[in-house]
C-alpha cells in the first residue's frame, strides 16, 4: 500500500463552505457530505484536526466598519465558529467518527477547553478534534488559528479546502482568463508576491514552523485523500521546493 505523504493534517474550512449554494447559514446536507469525505481519510489512519471559519454566520470586519466595536464584533464571530464546529462534530459522529470540539473561550456545557496535551491525546486515539472560537482573542483570523493550532499539534500540513477554487493563481481566474495557476510555491513567494492565500500572520507562522499548505477544491469528491497521498492537485506551498 502507498504510504501517505501527510499523516497528521489540519483541514481549514471556510464557514461559507458549510452554507452550500446559499452562501449563508448552515446546510446540513452539505455538512454531511463533507463529514463523509473526511471520514474516508480518517478511516485510513490519518490523524485529523479541523478549523472552521464563521463567515456563513457573521463577519466581524464589515460589522466594525458599520460602527460596531471591533473587539465585540470579533468575539461575536468567534461564537459563530463554535456553532459551525458543533454542527460538523455532530455530522462526523453520525457517520461513526469519534469527535471532540475544543474552544479557546471556555464554554464547558458545549465543548472542552483548548488544552494542547489533551488535543494530542485525542488525535493519537483516533479522534478528530475541531478547534473553535479562534485563538480566543480579537483581531486574529481563523487562518491564523489554523496556522497556530497546526504548529501546536505538529501537523504535517494545513489543507485549505476551498469552495470551487482549485488552487492559487497569479490573478483572479473569474475575472482574468489569462490567469495562471501555480502548482508549487514557497512560503516566501506567497509573502513577497502578496498572494492572499492566508493573511500575513498565518503565512509567516506556517513558514516559520515549516508547515506545508495545500490549497485545493473541496467540491471534487476524493480530493482530501488525493492531497494526503501526495497527488499533484491544487497548489502546494512549502519551504522545501
UniProtKB/Swiss-Prot annotation:
CDD domains: AAK_UMPK-PyrH-Ec (cd04254). One of its GO terms (cellular component) is cytoplasm. Keywords: Allosteric enzyme, ATP-binding, Cytoplasm, Kinase, Nucleotide-binding, Pyrimidine biosynthesis, Transferase. Allosterically activated by GTP. Inhibited by UTP. It is an enzyme of class 2 (transferase). It is found in: Cytoplasm. Belongs to the UMP kinase family. Residues 20-25 are annotated as: Involved in allosteric activation by GTP. This is Uridylate kinase. Catalyzes the reversible phosphorylation of UMP to UDP. ATP binds at residues 12-15, 55, 59, 163, 169, 172. It comes from Streptococcus gordonii (strain Challis / ATCC 35105 / BCRC 15272 / CH1 / DL1 / V288).
